[in-house]
Amino acid sequence: MKHSALKLGASLLLALGLSTQAMAEEYNFDIKGQHAFIHFKIKHLGYSWLMGEFRTFDGTFSYDEAHPENNKVSVSIDAASLDSNHAERDKHLRSGDFFDVENFPTASFSSTSFKSTGKDKGILHGTLSLHGVSKAIDIEISQIGTGPDPWGGYRRGFEGHTTLHLSDYNMKKSAMLGPLAENVELFLSVEGVRQ
């Protein structure tokens, strides 16, 4: 009788553990539908904003509403897809003076932890690998919305922003754009489709 009770207790604990794990939802970025964006802006000589985006990237995220500390994000970016709406400038930004996409074709971000700062928002801690350098960064995240889509799927959307320092990634030529070009504001908007 005691053995049966122990066995039943172990089964219940296992079931509870599995149900807790099942609460985490896995999402893929909606790249095909173009409902994901990575934009940036940087000051040009301190007189105006130079704006652009990375047009080719992919990513996934795991969302656990009950245990937000388990939330995870992974993103891979094609550095050569940088687009600032000016062909000659983009060629220069892709060159060895800046992103050097021939030697460093991919940038990536992988989260290490998440801290909730209120309902539907928090700080995503992780590592950004760019231009051959990996640095810890924090991204402020807010959930935009969630719910079913017209095609039988389920979606969840977030936006986030952070500030990068080009010298942290050995882009010393950033001084060519003026001292205020050291800081790059990065903004992302992501809609994920639940798997």
List PLM regions with ranges.
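Bacterial N-terminal signal peptides that target proteins for export
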Residues: M1-A10
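Hydrophobic membrane-targeting alpha-helices
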Residues: S4, G17-A22
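Bacterial N-terminal signal peptides
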Residues: G9-S19
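Low-complexity, acidic/polar, glycine-enriched regions of mature
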Residues: A22-Q195
